Amino acid sequence: MTNKKAFKEACKFIAGGVNSPVRAFANVQSEPKFISHGKGAYIFDIDGNSYIDYVQSWGPLLFGHCDKDIQKACQKALHKGSSFGAPTLLETELAKLVLSDFPHLEKIRFVSSGTEATMSAIRLARGFTKKDKILKFEGCYHGHSDSLLVSAGSGAATFNSPSSLGVLEDVAKRTLVAKYNDINSVKELFEKNKDIACVIIEPIAGNMGLVPAKQDFLEELAKICKNNQTLLIFDEVMSGYRASYLGSYGINHIQADIITFGKVIGGGLPAAAFASRAEIMDILSPLGGVYQSGTLSGNPLAMAAGIASLTKAKKKTKLYDKLGKLAKKLTQGMKKLADEKGLPLQACHVGSMFGYFFTKDPVSNYQDALKSDLALFSKFHKNMLENGIYLAPSQFETGFICSKMDDKIIDTTLEAVRESFKRI
C-alpha cells in the first residue's frame, strides 16, 4: 500500500485520517507519510523512502528511534505485565530520579499526557490559592483542555484556529491572555484582576515555533507572581530534558511553583507529570480535596522507558553539549544559505531544540511569528521532504536533534537546504 492509498483509507475510518491534526500535512498542501519503522536518526515510510527525522515524535526521542537501552527496559517491564492499575516500584524510582535534580520540587504525580499534566496543574493551583482565573500567553500551547485552548499555539495556530469550537465562553472568560516577552501586558492584567490563581507559561516556547522567553522577563514575571500570591507554572512538557538536562531551570535558574513534564520523561511512551513543593502537592486526593486520577497513570512500561531515558541522559555528561553544537551548526548554516539566496530567515536553537521563521525581523512573540511567510515555508517543507529531510509540517512547531545525529547528518541536511532554496 502507498502513502496516498493509506491516507485515503484512513480518512474513511479515522476523523481527518489522523489522530492529531498537524499530522495531516494539510498546512503544507500535502499528504502525510505513513511510517513503517524508525532507526536512530531515520524514519522509513511505507513507500520505502527514508528520511532524516527532525520531528523525533515531537520531542520525546532524545536518543532517536529504537534505542537499545530503552527497548531493553520496556521488554523487561512488559515481560512482567503491561498494566496493573496499582502502584509499582518503577513509579517511585522515576519520581526520585526527577526530584533529585530539582531542589525546589518535593513531590510529583504521574499522568499519561502533557494535556493531563497542565490541566491537573491548573486545577491544583486553583485549589491551593482558592482563586478562579488563570493567565497564559498568546501563542503558548498547553494541551487541549478547555481553559487552556485560548489563544493557543501548535496545531491550533497551524490551522488558524487559536481557540476552539466547544470551549464555552464562561470557561474562556476566566483565562486571561498576555503577550509573550512583554511584562507590561502582564502588569496590566494583574492591575485589573485580583483573583489570578496561576500564571502558566512555556519558558522556552516551542509551540509558536521556537521562541525562548527573555531572562529579565521571566525574573520579573516570577516577582509579580510572588507579590500577588499567584502560583507560577512552567510548562516544560517539551523543553524539559531537551533544552538542557534540567530544561529551562538549567538555563534561567528560576524556581517555578509547579513544573509540568512530558515527552522525554516517558522515553517515547505515554507519560507526563507535574511536580511542586509538598504543601501544594499534598492537597491532591487522597490527601486533600483536589481530585486527579487516571487508569494508565504511572503505567509500568512508560515508567521503565522514562527511567532508562533519564538515567542515560544523566550519565552522558557531554550529551547536551553535543546536541547543542549540532543544533547551532544547523541553524547557523540555514541562516547563511538563506542570506546567500536573499531569503528572509530567522533561525535559533536552545539546546537540542531548534526553529526557523521565514521573516526578516527577529521573533520574540506570537505576533512576530505570524509574520512568517507561510507560502515560503510550505514550498521549503515540500522540497526538503523530497530531499529526504523530515521536518515538522507546520511553521509553528519546533525541530529536535537526537543523540544518533552527527556532523555528517547535519552536512547532508544543509546540502538539502541549499538545494531546496534553489528551487524556491
Predicted region positions:
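Conserved N-terminal phosphate-binding loop of PLP-dependent enzymes in the Aspartate aminotransferase
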Residues: M1-I424
